[in-house]
């Protein structure tokens, strides 16, 4: 929809000059007709241009359902024809097992030549009947006469004969006249006899069977496309084109503007009429117009009219590319899952090793405690008890925690090898390693050289003796017992 401005008043000459331009523009618009391309599908080609857009799932499923019903109807018709053919064959067989068409009636000798000629022409026998047996032919009289009926008019459902006479005359003038009448009657009933023949019935059965099979197979193919395919190139293309058309319409209607004589915009709050040249108003009106066009039944069914879908070969190429990429990413995902599983296995092994190490440490600690208990028991038996806790010997407590494990066969102290025990546990060596010495030189009063030397030596010996726990001999302090 565009803005239409009525032409102003002008003279006749100007109007005549503008006519060729208008005609030219109209002719251009007429020649520039938008083409319509049939929407693609796999199993709905029988519908021709009525196929909806590929993104219109509702329309596609509707046509699939209708087409499936038509196919089922064809199969139902085929089944009905088979039942009719079977019942007709059973009813037409008499007690002797011979169809009435194979029964030959001996005609009178008067008409043998004529009927023999007719049978030679048509190749079908005739049946002799009385006129009195047909009420429609003998309604107002009781005249009796012979009537010959062609056996091709036998009804398929009942063994009775139809009332379509070939010749009906009580007295025939001549055999030639009778054969002429029979030829004309047979020419008129030729098409009727064809539609009642077995060939026409066979043709209908084959037609309904093939039509039902083709229609149902096409419906199944389209249903598989709609359900199995996760990526449909036609559907994705139709969605993209529909969205582009919607946004292009918004831009188009925005630039076209608003005709104030046709459109009025009111404020939702105050109800006042707003000017149409405001950008916000133009944008809102353009959006509404685009939505209205998108909701058009024809656009909703077919999509954009000027949309040209991709060809079937391009559809197959895109589908193949999608499947290749899907397989590639599936391989990548499998490789990542394998790597994650490997890392998870490493974490599991690490946790198992951690638990195993904790168990080993607890087991070793338990064994050490049991060995300490065993050594304590042996020491008690031999009289070598451990130093009570809280007591110190030689200024350190490390010796109280040390223990010697004896063999099980040691029962008395004489069985212990003292040299080996001393080698393993040397108290003087441990004392030397664990004892730290601190030597301090403290100056004294200045006296003669001999006095300084003697006093220094005495201070040094006293310091060393204090560290070692020994009292010097020259000290005047009384000896105190050490603990």
From Swiss-Prot:
The chain crosses the membrane at residues 60-76, 206-222. GO terms for cellular component: i-AAA complex. It comes from the Eukaryota. It is found in: Mitochondrion inner membrane. Residues 1-27 are annotated as: Disordered. Residues 9-20 have a biased composition (Basic and acidic residues). It is a multi-pass membrane protein. One of its GO terms (molecular function) is misfolded protein binding. It holds the Pfam family Mgr1. One of its GO terms (biological process) is protein quality control for misfolded or incompletely synthesized proteins. Residues 77-205 are mitochondrial matrix. Its main location: mitochondrion. Residues 1-59, 223-483 are mitochondrial intermembrane. The keyword Mitochondrion applies. Keywords: Membrane, Mitochondrion, Mitochondrion inner membrane, Transmembrane, Transmembrane helix. Belongs to the MGR1 family. Component of the mitochondrial inner membrane i-AAA protease complex required for mitochondrial inner membrane protein turnover. Component of the mitochondrial inner membrane i-AAA protease complex. This is Mitochondrial inner membrane i-AAA protease complex subunit MGR1. It comes from Candida glabrata (strain ATCC 2001 / BCRC 20586 / JCM 3761 / NBRC 0622 / NRRL Y-65 / CBS 138) (Yeast).
């Amino acid at each position: 929809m565009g803005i239409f401005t009525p032409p102003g008043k002008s003279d006749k000459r100007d109007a005549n000059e503008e006519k060729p331009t208008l005609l030219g523009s109209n002719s251009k618009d007429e020649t520039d007709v938008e083409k319509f391309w049939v929407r693609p599908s796999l199993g709905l080609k029988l519908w021709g241009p009525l196929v909806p857009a590929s993104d219109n799932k509702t329309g596609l499923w509707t046509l699939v359902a209708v087409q499936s019903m038509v196919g089922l109807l064809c199969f139902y018709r085929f089944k009905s024809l088979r039942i009719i053919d079977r019942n007709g064959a059973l009813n037409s067989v008499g007690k002797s097992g011979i169809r009435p068409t194979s029964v030959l009636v001996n005609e009178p000798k008067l008409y043998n030549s004529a009927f023999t000629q007719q049978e030679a022409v048509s190749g079908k026998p005739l049946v002799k009947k009385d006129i009195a047996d047909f009420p429609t032919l003998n309604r107002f009289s009781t005249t009796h006469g012979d009537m010959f009926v062609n056996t091709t008019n036998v009804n398929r459902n009942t063994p009775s004969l139809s009332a379509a006479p070939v010749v009906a005359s009580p007295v025939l003038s001549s055999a030639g006249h009778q054969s002429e009448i029979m030829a004309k009657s047979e020419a008129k009933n030729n098409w009727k006899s064809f539609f009642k023949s077995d060939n026409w019935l066979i043709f209908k059965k084959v037609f309904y069977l093939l039509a039902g099979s083709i229609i149902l197979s096409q419906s199944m193919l389209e249903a598989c496309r709609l359900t199995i395919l996760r990526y449909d190139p036609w559907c994705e293309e139709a969605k993209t084109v529909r969205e582009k058309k919607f946004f292009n319409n918004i831009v188009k209607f925005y630039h076209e503007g608003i005709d104030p004589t046709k459109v009025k915009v009111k404020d939702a709050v105050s109800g006042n009429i707003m000017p149409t040249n405001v950008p916000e108003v133009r944008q809102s009106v353009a959006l509404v117009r685009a939505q209205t066009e998108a909701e058009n039944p024809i656009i909703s069914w077919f999509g954009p009219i000027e949309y040209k879908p991709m060809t079937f070969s391009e559809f197959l190429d895109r589908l193949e590319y999608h499947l290749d990429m899907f397989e590639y990413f599936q391989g990548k995902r499998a490789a990542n899952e394998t790597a994650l599983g490997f890392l998870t296995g490493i974490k599991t092994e690490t946790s198992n090793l951690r638990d195993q190490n904790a168990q080993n440490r607890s087991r070793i600690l338990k064994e050490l405690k049991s060995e300490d208990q065993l050594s304590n028991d042996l020491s008690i038996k031999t009289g070598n008890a451990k130093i009570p806790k809280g007591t110190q010997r030689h200024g350190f407590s490390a010796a109280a925690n040390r223990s010697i494990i004896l063999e099980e066969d040691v029962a008395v102290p004489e069985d212990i090898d003292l040299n080996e025990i001393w080698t393993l546990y040397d108290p003087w060596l441990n004392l030397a390693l664990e004892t730290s010495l601190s030597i301090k030189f403290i100056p004294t009063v200045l006296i003669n050289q001999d006095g300084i030397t003697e006093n220094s030596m005495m201070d040094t010996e006293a310091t060393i003796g204090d560290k070692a726990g020994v009292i010097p001999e020259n000290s005047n302090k009384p000896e105190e017992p050490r603990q």
